[in-house]
Amino acid sequence: MIKKIDGTIVDLLFAPLSAGEVIFSISLAAVTRSVVIGIVSIVVFYLIIDIEIKNYLTLIAFTLLSSFVLGCIGIIAGLWAEKFDHMATVTNFVIVPLYFLSGTFYSIERLPDILQAVSKANPFFYMIDGFRYSFIGTSDGSISFGLVYLTALSFVSWFVCYLLYKKGYKIKS
């Protein structure tokens, strides 16, 4: 988004890189940023409270998959948006509702069956459930299904980013 506004998107468009390489690089930059922030957060919280990680492998897997999916969502939003208000629209009407309906603040077992089914279609549910399982050892859903679901969503979201960037959606005149 910022590259579109300040005109530096041209540097990416004229770089001797394929669309796949550019999108993969930007996605991995999002993952790197997320991992660094996560590590710093865990270290700071560890100094304040006693944090026990029950499953390191699950934590790593869900961190990488969640940050990759969210990075791709950010790329899609950045390609679609023409101004910062459009980015706020994505945050306010897509990200925040999915987050609040993900079972972060409550167990989805307390919801009626229909809302449980809706929650289990929400990718944020599996992201948060994976982190919950990593730290406290309990989950509301299937961790293995969550890994498969987020892996598939990673491929799909990356492919959508790839197609939009390759087409030049809202970046090439």
Model segments located where?
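Membrane-interfacial helix-loop-helix junctions in multi-pass membrane proteins
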Residues: 49, 99-156
